[in-house]
Amino acid sequence: MLSHDVNIYKNTVEAKKLNDKKFVVLLDPDKCNNQKLNQVIKLSNDAHVDYFYIGGSLLLHSDLDNFLIRIKEQSNIPTILFPGTTHQISQEADAILYLSMISGRNPDLLIGKHVESAAHIKASGIEVISTGYMLIDGGRPTSVNYISNTLPIPHDKNSIAVSTAIAGELLGLKLIYLEAGSGADVPVSPSMINAVSTHIDIPLIVGGGIRTPEIAKLSAEAGADIIVIGNALEKDPELIIDMSAAIHSVNVKSTSDA
């Protein structure tokens, strides 16, 4: 396990300054048995994946602590909680994305659930990274839409996304996360990614509907600092190798252009 002296957010900010794109594999413990987890960890180690995000909309049956311990036994890749509920917390993680759903108007997901979990999270000692979570229409209803009871930002309304992201930054949030949803028909568009990244100074995460290395690369080139892929890798874990190469190739291109 990483030392808690390692500051994941500080490293993320430094990477943004260097245009060093990061690739995240999203793991849902409810969908990942031991055999598949071992396969994903090995592929992730070989492909130099930057982070694991751990979470899901429900996490009904999983022992989160043991899931994280199994990862730590096989990998030095940092583990970051991506919680769907306030119960998805573990001291075995290296950090947690403290999500505020700023795209919607559900008060529980803006601040209400945070009040319930704040004392426990602070006492856990893990690094907390406040994150402005923005749902973007991915062409079909997703689990996040249903669970959050919120409407996504329309796919083609860049101006709304930009204004929302700026508001999140001005409120002091440390990251902005554009999310099309697990299994989305269409990912967040490169034009929206570019518009948002141009207008904020904090790191930008993009996920949902990224099924191919080509889409992943386009998202990174458009301005995403961190690319999150989950559903596509659940179906074909071997994609990790090509996804990583595509995302990290943007780093090489940026360095050579400089």
Where are these regions (language model features)?
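Glycine-rich phosphate-binding active-site loops on the catalytic face of alpha/beta enzymes
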Residues: 53-59, 95, 99-110, 180-183, ...
